[in-house]
């Protein structure tokens, strides 16, 4: 019985040892994507970005800072009924775990003025910075479509 207990504790310890900054960044990215589906992309971006964020996406100049993102989103709201979802496929982290990135694929879905489906897919890289409370927020997001909207 003691042998099974020791093996069980060893397995648990090895599982816990596998969790680390990369896994935490993947988890943050997944929670960020979930919020995008539940509350809208802009709300999720504002909730997960740092004050000094850099956003490089779309056909506009880079957006520098959270206040600039808030202003941009106020003038350019999420299209009604649209969704933005993404899936992280890889994470890298510094040895200290204070910063790193995730990368993956994204899917944007909406309808045009005539009700026709618009679907755009692409790739992204998001830079993450560990906060004082040990959670991660992103300070860099770069996204690009891999083909024209259809």
Question: Where are the predicted features?
Answer:
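Generic short beta-strand segments
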Residues: 52, 103-110, 144
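Bacterial N-terminal signal peptides that target proteins for export
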Residues: 1-7
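Short beta-strand edge/turn micro-motifs at domain boundaries
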Residues: 121-146
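Short, low-complexity N-terminal intrinsically disordered segments enriched in polar/charged residues
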Residues: 2, 12-51, 149-150
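A solvent-exposed, acidic/Ser-Thr-rich amphipathic alpha-helical stretch
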Residues: 22-26, 40-92, 103, 116-119
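Long compositionally biased, domain-poor regions of proteins
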Residues: 27, 34, 47, 73, ...
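A short, structured loop/turn motif at beta-sheet edges
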Residues: 91-100, 113, 129-135
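Short, structured motif recognition centered on aromatic/hydrophobic residues
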Residues: 32, 86, 99-103, 127-128, ...
């Amino acid at each position: 019985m003691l042998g099974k207990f020791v093996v069980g504790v060893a397995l648990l310890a090895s599982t816990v040892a596998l969790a680390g900054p990369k896994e935490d960044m993947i988890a943050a990215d997944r929670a960020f994507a979930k919020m995008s589906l539940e509350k809208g992309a802009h709300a999720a971006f504002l909730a997960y970005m740092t004050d000094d964020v850099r956003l490089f996406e779309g056909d506009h100049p880079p957006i520098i800072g959270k206040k600039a993102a808030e202003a941009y989103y106020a003038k350019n709201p999420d299209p009604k009924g649209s969704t933005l979802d993404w899936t992280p496929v890889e994470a890298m982290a510094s040895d200290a775990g204070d910063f790193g990135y995730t990368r993956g694929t994204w899917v944007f879905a909406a309808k045009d003025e005539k009700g026709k489906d618009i679907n755009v897919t692409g790739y992204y890289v998001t830079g993450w910075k560990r906060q004082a409370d040990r959670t991660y927020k992103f300070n860099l997001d770069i996204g690009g479509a891999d083909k024209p909207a259809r």
